[in-house]
């Protein structure tokens, strides 16, 4: 688990497994939250195809199995992907409504393609299963 600024611990609030859409994609996406409300989206055991101008989107949908869902549902851009292989973190604030934005998509802006998506489930819902 990543540590917050100042060494404070982060608690997992949502997690999901990537599935491929137009390119092979796998790994886990987990959102951690600090006491101050700041959040970290962490990819672990992550791998996708290398591509031009790929960004990390939080999508306002339960899942995004195609390209049109991302465009139709709406999204928040967390910035360019840090690499196509390996663990990585993306920080964002408490203003992003996780009850609305329930999927992580890897979006190629150049070709308008969804490389892969991780539908997120609340951590308490996951542990209840």
Give the ranges of each region predicted by the language model.
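Extracytoplasmic
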Residues: 24-26, 38, 51, 99
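Short, exposed beta-strand-loop hairpins at the edges of beta-sheets
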Residues: 93-117
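Transition segment at domain starts
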Residues: 1-36, 70-73, 125-129
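Solvent-exposed coil/turn segments that connect beta secondary-structure elements
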Residues: 34, 44-46, 59-62, 83, ...
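C-terminal end-helix/capping segment
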Residues: 115-129
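N-terminal post-signal-peptidase region of extra-cytosolic proteins
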Residues: 26-29, 39-44, 63, 88-90
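An anionic, turn-rich surface loop/hairpin at beta-sheet edges
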Residues: 66-93
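Beta-strand signatures of extracellular beta-sandwich domains
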Residues: 55-57
């Amino acid at each position: 688990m990543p540590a917050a600024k100042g060494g404070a611990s982060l608690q997992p609030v949502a997690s999901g497994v990537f599935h491929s859409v137009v390119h092979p994609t796998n790994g886990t996406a987990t959102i951690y939250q600090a006491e101050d409300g700041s959040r970290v989206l962490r990819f672990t055991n992550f791998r996708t195809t290398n591509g031009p101008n790929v960004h990390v989107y939080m999508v306002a949908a339960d899942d995004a199995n195609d390209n049109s869902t991302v465009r139709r549902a709406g999204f928040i851009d967390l910035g360019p992907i840090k690499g196509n292989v390996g663990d990585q973190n993306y920080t964002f604030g408490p203003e992003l409504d996780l009850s609305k934005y329930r999927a992580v998509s890897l979006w190629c802006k150049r070709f308008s393609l969804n490389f892969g998506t991780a539908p997120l489930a609340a951590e308490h819902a996951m542990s209840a299963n």
